[in-house]
Design a protein with these regions (language model features):
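Hydrophobic alpha-helical transmembrane segments of membrane transport and translocation systems
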Residues: 335-348
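Flexible loop/N-cap segments at domain edges
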Residues: 231, 298, 302, 341
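Residue-level signature of catalytic and energy-coupling elements of molecular machines
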Residues: 62, 122, 258, 274, ...
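Conserved G1/Walker A P-loop phosphate-binding module
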Residues: 2-96, 275, 284, 339
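Switch II of P-loop NTPase G domains
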Residues: 92-148
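C-terminal-of-GTPase-core extension/linker across diverse P-loop GTPases
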Residues: 22-30, 40, 48-51, 201-251
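Canonical P-loop GTPase G-domain recognition
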Residues: 152-157, 162-225
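Membrane-inserting effector segments that mediate pore formation, membrane fusion
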Residues: 242-280, 284-334
Length: 348
């Protein structure tokens, strides 16, 4: 219960920031940047993933390997046929497993769609299922045809699981993958080319994680990148998007001729930026973390940020070019703070 309350408080803080900006001249161009931040940060929700396949095709093991921070003694609770809200050490995923050979598969799928529409699909095959891939894919294709009007086509990731059990090396794995690909093409399933993955060795999971984040809707990307521990490129990309959006707002605020508007707007905005980057990394922004981050800046970095704030406030008191100087200082200060947070939270 505490986390939704914190999220609501942050959303209200962003709303207050928008109201402040509404009273400041020359900020209409900033609404797009704030809209992007709202979609990414406060309209965020967990990704919804449906895993179709046979009961022994390694779906739960795959999920655990995708989101796991450290080994756990007990398996994740992934009941078949119903949506399950997985929460594991900060990772959040709405997960649905359906066995396509189960007589109840159709009714389970229909009931699940009444609850929520998935964002993407896993269709899993273990090596011993490859020879029977066509009927499995045809059952999955039949289920996917039941998506409600307006839902759009779902991105389907076909996965050859337990790839570490195939032959003696990558040549045999690729040969098996091609057999699976041919079977899927024959049945006409609209899906990505099969990916060979292993929950044990981790083979293929980094590329799968990155592809998942790219395929997901905007409002799920932050939670997805946070959950998928191997999606390091996605985390950096989203982190830089957050910094760029906040920098754009900072520059616009810096252009305004009102002294000390930086204190009203830039402080909350930069706090929002750093807390978002910490959240993206999977870490909380408590006092200890803040102290460690500030310590990582060093004396020069900390003084530099303080001097930037003083300079941009003083510059606004200078007629004419002072606002331009303040805008440059505000943007540079926000960028520097954001990049230092990226280095600490996302690159360490």
């Amino acid at each position: 219960m505490k986390e939704p309350m914190k999220d609501r408080a942050k959303e209200l803080a962003l709303d207050q920031l928008v109201k402040v900006l509404d009273r400041v001249p020359l900020v209409s161009s900033v609404k797009n940047d704030l809209g992007e931040l709202r979609s990414l940060l406060y309209l965020r929700r967990p990704p919804r993933v449906v895993a179709l396949g046979l009961g022994s095709s390694g779906r739960s093991t795959l999920l655990r390997s995708l989101i796991e921070r450290r080994p756990v003694r007990h398996p994740l609770d992934t009941d078949h046929g119903d949506w399950v809200q997985i929460e594991h050490e900060g990772a959040k995923v709405d997960w649905l497993e359906i066995d396509v050979d189960d007589p109840a598969a159709r009714s389970q799928w229909t009931h699940a769609l009444d609850e929520k529409v998935p964002d993407l699909v896993f269709l899993t095959f273990e090596p011993r299922n490859v020879q029977d891939a066509k009927p499995i894919a045809e059952r999955a294709k039949s289920l996917l045809a039941d998506l409600p009007d307006g839902a759009g086509a779902l991105r389907v990731f076909t996965l050859l699981t337990h790839s570490d059990l195939i032959g003696r090396g990558p040549v045999e794995v690729e040969a098996e993958r091609r057999v699976l690909e041919a079977a899927l093409e024959e049945c006409g399933l609209d899906a990505d080319p099969p990916r060979a993955v292993s929950a044990i060795s981790g083979h293929g999971l980094a590329a799968l994680s990155e592809a998942m984040v790219l395929a997901l809707p905007e409002e799920t990307r932050l939670e997805a990148a946070r959950a998928l521990t191997r999606a390091q490129e996605a985390r950096l990309r989203i982190g830089n998007e957050i910094v760029q959006a906040c920098t754009s707002v900072s520059v616009t605020v810096g252009v305004t001729p009102i002294p000390f508007s930086d204190m009203v707007v830039l402080g909350p905005l930069q706090a929002l930026m750093v807390s978002a980057l910490a959240y993206l990394s999977g870490r909380g922004l408590d006092k200890k973390t803040v102290a460690e981050w500030l310590g990582s800046l060093g004396v020069v970095g900390g003084l530099g940020m303080g001097l930037r704030f003083s300079a941009q406030t003083i510059a606004k008191l200078v007629p004419g070019a002072g606002n331009v100087i303040a805008a440059g200082v505000a943007g540079a200060g926000t960028t520097a703070m954001g990049q230092s947070a990226i280095r600490y939270f996302l690159k360490n």
